Amino acid sequence: MALSPKPMTVVRAEVEGKVNWLVVGHTGVIGHDRILISMSKSHYTNQGIKDSKRLSVNLVSREILPKADYVGSVSGATVNKSEVFAYHIGENGTPVIDASPLTMECEVVDIYETEGFDNFICAIVNTYAAPEVLDNNGKLDYTKLKPVLFEFPTYSYLATGEIIGKCLNLDKRPGMCAKEPMSADGIVRLSKIEVYPQYLDEYMKYATEVGEVSLRIE
């Protein structure tokens, strides 16, 4: 699966009146305020999420990785996992892992079923971050957060890497060579772009966040 690795998460849901924790490796971003949690239909936790429409999504650090690995290896149908993590109740009423560097309280807004999977579309209601993973401006610093990544094909845990460059500002060369006109309304966010003359008007119309536009003649 070429889109691995992804951040490893521990999802909490209430099932039959008790807290249950489950590792989820299939996650995604939908827009700026929605996330996707994709879970095999075989999981015990799915019905609890469908019933309550609430869950918490907890990122995993190296410190809590052993416990996360454990809750991902046993089923809540046969093992009571409610006390594996120390937790508190978030503002939206869902348990939040005390030691997680970052947790999102979510509400399920839609569910899409695909073969073998329940796919929960979730709105983020609250986000909690440990002070030690924030920069001086109160923003997330991923060099401090260092979430554990899960690589699905080999079932391996990876560490987050170093920063290798700043987006849209890698060097002085054009960020993109535009050979075709834009076919739909949208935003192109690039530090520089080269455009063939016949497409210049089209790109000037849509590319509102390009730092510098130049003509490509060869």
What residue ranges belong to the model's regions?
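Basic, polyanion-binding surface patches
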Residues: 1-218
